[in-house]
């Protein structure tokens, strides 16, 4: 149908996202590093949990951001014992940890991240939460493989700056979660992604914006979408 047609702008945005994913993968590819002082590792705490991550890896730029965002995501997710959640573009599993605390041992949290070092750091930090499954895989591929399986109650997405895009959002919507939490740092890409959710039958239930990147045009936005 007409709603499924791809425009030239859609193709350009898809290619931009793929290029961004490729750059992200290249940034995390194995390469020679020299540590002149210290361990080459950084220690971060969120909600009382300790993460030890590579100093060259990804963490939120603002020192208070990981705690603030995860608090809001936990509030919006509102999962009960036995709940199911997906954490897409999960990094080292900061959001996955908060979701897992809500679902408890009878629940399942599936966390997907393409950067293997981040997945390894997350596995170490979340080793006491065996109901969290961390997958080192491209989100674009993983979601297409899991549509039609057990439906998640909540999906959290924190994609790269270019956004999640039509393919991923279409697959997430097809999975049928009751609530979706979408995170974005580029307002234009964020708005495009929200319009895709709305076209798929989701409504914007809440929206928060954080000035986490002072002196830049970037604003961290979190949206709660529901059916």
Give the ranges of each region predicted by the language model.
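Accessory RNA-recognition modules of RNA-modification enzymes
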Residues: 1-157, 164-168, 176
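S-adenosylmethionine
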Residues: 135-221, 226
